[in-house]
């Protein structure tokens, strides 16, 4: 019998205590990415609700969102658009500032990465507080994207990121939640 999605993900996501600082349980998806069956299953599950729908672009947040988003884009026959930290893209960009734990940062994308009205799915590995994903949503809306959903492998529900995106009217899809961060 095929293991459940939850069992597959639990067996292939490594938890590292006290990284990057004491008290944090870091959820490492590199072990998921290195397991061909688990990686394929995660991508298939992320894609499933959108198969047959018109999806123009997948926007992936640096860095693990590039890996997952590229695979999702391939499966949906959609283009891929990187959302990066400021100063990393070589052409004309649009930029948005967002709050970090200790200050501000900025992310950007190419101005011509998404045309107004194009249907976009935002992809990243994990949603925690939602600050980065919220900034990505604002960036995509700034250039006129129609955001169909935001998809993540992991949700840390105690940190409220999902609710933050849903309050912005963005449907959120996650594959597994870890209570307690």
Swiss-Prot record:
Enzyme nomenclature, EC number: 2.4.2.7
Signal peptide: none
Known pathway: Purine metabolism; AMP biosynthesis via salvage pathway; AMP from adenine: step 1/1
Any one of the GO BP annotations: adenine salvage
Reaction catalysed by this enzyme: AMP + diphosphate = 5-phospho-alpha-D-ribose 1-diphosphate + adenine
MF term (GO), any: adenine phosphoribosyltransferase activity
Subcellular location: Cytoplasm
Enzyme category, top tier: transferase
GO cellular component terms given for this protein: cytoplasm
Keywords: Cytoplasm, Glycosyltransferase, Purine salvage, Transferase
Main location (coarse class): cytoplasm
InterPro entries: Ade_phspho_trans (IPR005764), PRibTrfase_dom (IPR000836), PRTase-like (IPR029057), UPRTase/APRTase (IPR050054)
Record's keyword annotation contains Lyase: no
Coiled-coil region list: none
UniProt cross-references to NCBIfam families, sorted A to Z: apt, PRK02304.1-3, PRK02304.1-5
Function statement: Catalyzes a salvage reaction resulting in the formation of AMP, that is energically less costly than de novo synthesis.
Subunit structure: Homodimer.
Family to which this protein belongs: Belongs to the purine/pyrimidine phosphoribosyltransferase family.
Name of the protein in question: Adenine phosphoribosyltransferase
Gene that specifies this protein: apt
């Amino acid at each position: 019998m095929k293991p459940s999605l939850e069992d597959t993900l639990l067996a292939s996501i490594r938890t590292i205590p006290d990284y990057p600082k004491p008290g944090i349980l870091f959820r490492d998806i590199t072990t998921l990415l290195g397991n061909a069956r688990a990686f394929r299953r995660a991508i298939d599950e992320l894609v499933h609700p959108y198969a047959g729908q018109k999806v123009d672009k997948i926007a992936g947040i640096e860095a693990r969102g590039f890996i997952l988003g590229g695979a999702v884009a391939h499966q949906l026959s959609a283009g891929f658009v990187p959302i990066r930290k400021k100063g990393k893209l070589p052409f004309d960009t649009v930029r948005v500032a967002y709050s970090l734990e200790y200050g501000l940062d900025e992310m950007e994308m190419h101005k011509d990465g998404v045309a107004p009205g194009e249907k976009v799915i935002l992809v990243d590995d994990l949603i925690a507080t939602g600050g980065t994903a919220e900034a990505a949503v604002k960036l995509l809306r700034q250039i006129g994207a129609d955001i169909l959903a935001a998809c993540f492998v992991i949700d840390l529900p105690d940190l409220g990121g999902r609710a933050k995106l849903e309050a912005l009217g963005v449907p959120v899809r996650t594959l597994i939640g870890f209570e307690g961060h």
